[in-house]
């Protein structure tokens, strides 16, 4: 760690971690034995901890819950709770936009998922969908009309079109897609991101971006790396993340 980074590190008062391929291996669920020690040491130094994930709070596995983070920034910043379960911030997608999105997926011939604050449902179940979603949320139910029963905070595409897929003009000024798997993208509010969610927590605490350190690996961490005082990329990170990182783990 160079002198400049050491100086910046003295200002850190809260550390946010991504979950998949940062705290745990997404394919196997393995969590290094050193992780609980890291959280314990941060607490002993008076440094707060948080999770910043595209997952819903219902998808934060028990092993991560056991680390006792102070804050949970979930669904790419759309739903935030503290460790006591108090809601710090929430931003639902307008029902009319959800309905238009579903109509668009049918026109495109692709499948979708709908994510509430504490549950998620699938439009159908296929091998392609299972390959993408089961490592994150095993055994999700099929309910294509979930939006009629719950507020929706995030949606998914399930397809094999990759970066060739784009939202229609009528939705692209309200929603955006963030690719997280070769067969799936998160569909989130246009201003929604992990960075926006972390900023809500920082504002809630009366802190500044320079007081924040983040650990991440994926494209949905890009804005977070721009926002935080110190950004740490995992060795397995996407190249675009590594380019923005202050430090890359081995």
Q: How should these model regions be labeled?
A:
Residues 1-17, 207:
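Non-catalytic pre-domain segments flanking phosphatase-related domains
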Residues 11-28, 225:
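Asp-based phosphoryl-transfer active-site loop
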Residues 30-128:
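Active-site phosphate-binding/coordination module
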Residues 42, 76, 155, 225, ...:
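Residue-level signal for inorganic ion chemistry
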Residues 67-68, 76, 170-174, 227-228, ...:
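Short, structured coil segments at secondary-structure junctions
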Residues 104, 108-215, 219-227, 236:
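Conserved acidic, metal-coordinating active-site core of Asp-based
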Residues 208, 227, 231-250:
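Asp-based, Mg2+/Mn2+-dependent phosphohydrolase catalytic module
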